Amino acid sequence: MEKMNQGDRPFMTIQRNDSSDHLVLHMKNEMRNTKYKPVDYQQLRVLTEAKKLASASAELKIRKAMLTSKISKEQTLIKQHKQVWWQEYQRLNEVRYKMESEIKSLLNEENIGNECLCDLTNFEQELSEQWCTYLKNVINPIQQLRADLKYRQHHTLQHSHPHVEFNSVKVLEEVDFVKKQLKTVFERLGLEQQRIENDLSGWSIKILDHSLEEKTNLLSELPIELGSLECPYPDLKSSIHSEFCKFTQKYQKKLQDVDLQLEDIYRNCQLSEEDHWIYQAILDQYPGDLFGRRTLYLDMLQRYFPHKSRHDLIEHEKYCDQYRFAMEQRKILISNWNKNKKDFTQKAVLTLIEACAAHEMESTLAKDKKKQQELCADLKAKVLQWRAHQEEVARLEMEISARRREKEEEKEKLWKKKELLQRAEKKKKIKKYWAMKKQKWQEMEMRDLQRLEELKKLMAEQSLKDRERVKYRKELLERRLMEKKEAALQEAHEDKERARRLEALRKQVAVVAQFDPVRMMSDTMASKARMGIEIEEEFILQKPLFTLNTYNEQQIISDPRLRFELALREAGLHRTLYAKEILPKISPRKPPRKDMESTVFKI
């Protein structure tokens, strides 16, 4: 148990009265009083020792519970770490298989240069030969030595005879020799790995520097679209160039500020490059949507870096967040620059195109005006010639129309004569047609009258049959209604008979109890047992020294104020402003009585 601080000690009050002072005075003056008995210090010591043992056992239980909770918490964290490791292992395997398949497909393609393909195949063959040599010279002898040692150990345990001697010194020398060889091999491999990593880091730095130089050059260079276009107005082109330079300088200044911020963050970083790489790899293992992600990766970082404190890791986390935020700002700045550059380029290109179009329009207007004047002269001559031709055409058309009109008048006279003859013939044909039509109508009327009389006879016969059918159906319906009424009466009679039999059966099995108000109002055996009435009190072996009229442990723990304060203390928040504001607002489970309310602090 941790010791409580000065501010965590409970507020205690000591009350004294005149009777206690008189008692002390009597004891000092050795004046006896029949009200008080002499103290049995031996019994008090025994009781005190018993209390000490009980408190020691309780403290031991609390320590065991804390140790158990700590172990369970550690096991839970390890279990969560295992789940994350397994997911990361599966993801890395998938990435590995994907990369291997992509490399194989790339090598199998025919569009790669022969020289590059030969270099890759030779490098792969060289690596496979080196791996086979490593297995043959390093791994296989170790496995053989291990199997030999296991066989010898098993053989000596089974056949432990006094005449069988096991040369352990020779075996230990052989094992030490193998260890030295392995140590030299691993040192050589470590140096080679360090050299390759240095080469890769150097190439990555060169690539990054080259990409940064390209980006800065791209920021400062004029777009190709603006440089390739020609503008007939030099003032407009120079103003566009100056506007682009101002625009670029503003973004370059912002980018330099962000780069300086990144350099400051990188300079203040406390971890080395390798430790930072391990830190980033551990953070990437835990996905963002994982519950308790920060707790898990901080625990894993403390395991990987035991020489670093939690405060140092949190500080490095802050630096990483700042670096990531600055990089995102840099990306957003570059993307905004590209977008604004594209918009500016489009607007500038449109402006230059409009200027070129306006210049071409002016030149074309001047050319068109000159052509118009030439055309006007040609058209005037052509109009005069066309007018003479038109007058001659009009004269000829008038003569032709006069001749055509005479021919049409003659044709019209002939057509009128023919039309009079055709009308006389048509009248004769119409009279003949109406006579035939009238005869057909009379025949159809006679046929319809005969059919009407036949239908009336059939309808009369059908109505007679329908009346007979309705009469039959009515009688059948009345018969069914009578049967239903009889069935309902029979069912009602059966229900009455069934109710009568049930009532007789109920009277046979009815319970007849005597009226006993004393027994009814007295306590039951169960209630007496629960209330402890008429039950002998159990003998309490260890009684307390003094009877205390206070709260028990369960009542104290059940108070929501204490539980909330313990939760804040475990979280380390009991000294914050939030705790100071929220603790007075929590009300107890049972409000205090009005006569017990203190008015000391209300004055």
From Swiss-Prot:
Keywords: Coiled coil. Residues 365-429, 461-510 form a coiled coil. InterPro entries: CCDC148/CCDC112. This is Coiled-coil domain-containing protein 148. It comes from Macaca fascicularis (Crab-eating macaque). The lineage of its organism: Eukaryota, Metazoa, Chordata, Craniata, Vertebrata.
